[in-house]
C-alpha cells in the first residue's frame, strides 16, 4: 500500500505545475488586462522551446461551491518579449473538480509536429481522489495548435495516466495505466496520425511470508490506439481503455 501511495505521489510530481520564472511576470499582467474581475487558480506558463519568441500561458478560473468547482480555461500564446497575445482559446466549463479533485496544470512541449508548418503543444491536467482505501489518480491532456489568432483545441481530455485500486490493511488490488502520445508515419487531412501506446498493469496487495506488505503484478497488457484528424479535431474512441 505504501508503494501505491508513493506511485500516486510520483505521478503527481511528474505534472510540471510550476511556471518558469522567466514568464511569470506576464501572468499578473494578463489577468489584470483581460480578467480583472476574476481570480485565477494554479496558473502556469512556459517559454516554448520550439520557438522561444513565444510563451504558453494557462489561466484556470474556478467557480462554484466546494462540492463541485468548474474551471473555465484561457490558454494563450503570447510574445515572450512584449507579452502581447498572439492567439488564445477560451473554454468555459473546461474541467470540473468534485470528489475527484483537480490538483494542477502542466504544459507539455514535446515534439508534436503535425506537419511541416503546424506544431502543437499540450496542457496536462491532474486529478486525485481523497480516499486512502480507494486511491485514485488520473492525468489528461489537451492538444492545441495555432491558426492565425486562434488556438484550436484538437485533442480533448485524452487520458494518459490512471492509477487506483482498493486496499485496506495490506489486502486489496490495484491497477495502473500509463500511455504515451506518439506521432505516426501516416497523415489524415494533412495532420499526422497520433498513436496512443498504453501499458496496463493489474495486481494484488498482500502480506508475504516475511510479514511484509508487498505488491504482485498479476496481469500486464500493452495496447495501441490511433487517432485520426477529421479536419477539426482528433476524436477519441469510446472508451479509450
Tell me what each language-model feature is.
Residues 21-37, 138-152, 157-241:
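Acidic, small-residue rich beta-repeat scaffolds with periodic aromatic anchors
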Residues 94-142:
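Extracellular-facing segments of soluble proteins and assemblies that are Gly/Ser/Thr-biased and enriched
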Residues 14-18:
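N-terminal signal peptide c-region/cleavage motif recognized by signal peptidases
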Residues 22-71:
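Solvent-exposed N-terminal domain segments of exported/luminal and surface proteins
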